Amino acid sequence: MNRIPWLGPNEPFPDPLTTCDPDANVPGLFAVSERIYPGQLQSAYQLGIFPWYSDNQPVLWWSPDPRMVLIPDQFKCSDSLKKTLRHFIADESKAIVVDQDFSAIMRACATSERKGQDGTWITHEIVDAYTALFEQGRAHSIAVMDAGVLVGGLYCVCFGKAIFGESMFSRQADGSKIALAALSAFCVQNGIPMIDCQQETAHLRSLGAAPIERKTFLQSLQTSLNQSKIALSWNFTKQILQHWL
């Protein structure tokens, strides 16, 4: 049995495409570090690795097999959600706001109640690290607003045409679904082949996400990363939701 590597500053991650799980007893765990070092997130995401851990743990770096992904044009927009989107678009008090107050979206995700889990993995360190990515143009947020009040949203990471969905939340019925519908429509319009959802949940499956083999995911990821010079314009409004109507 191989040991899971403990990474220091500037130490490279093992490549999940060419390396077996270091410890068969903890499938998908590829590395551990004391903290998130500068540049680590960029290196990790480009290898299909992401951090997921709690406050009382070291940083755990994962690349699960299978990998949950959403093909953007396979987003399941039910008849009831379509009705919600029509009302949302028609109501002048409602809006989609992109890339404003990124850390507020992260904090909302962290405090969101979820069945069977909590948001403790969105630690202060995680908020700081992803806010730094946002400031570099590598992370983005979508906020769902109702009369100026934040009622839902999500945040994601973007390298080239690779989109990694991180977390979402609702404070009002369908708040997170509206945000994901907007992100999915944006991806369809920009030729983004898939949204990484990382781990399987019943909620994501109900919205069209499905698991694929890690190898398939990583091969597709490399193709998307090769389009890193493509600059996406994250400047859209709720009118993007018309895609599903």
Describe each region flagged by the PLM.
Residues 1-245:
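N-acyltransferase acceptor-side catalytic subdomain
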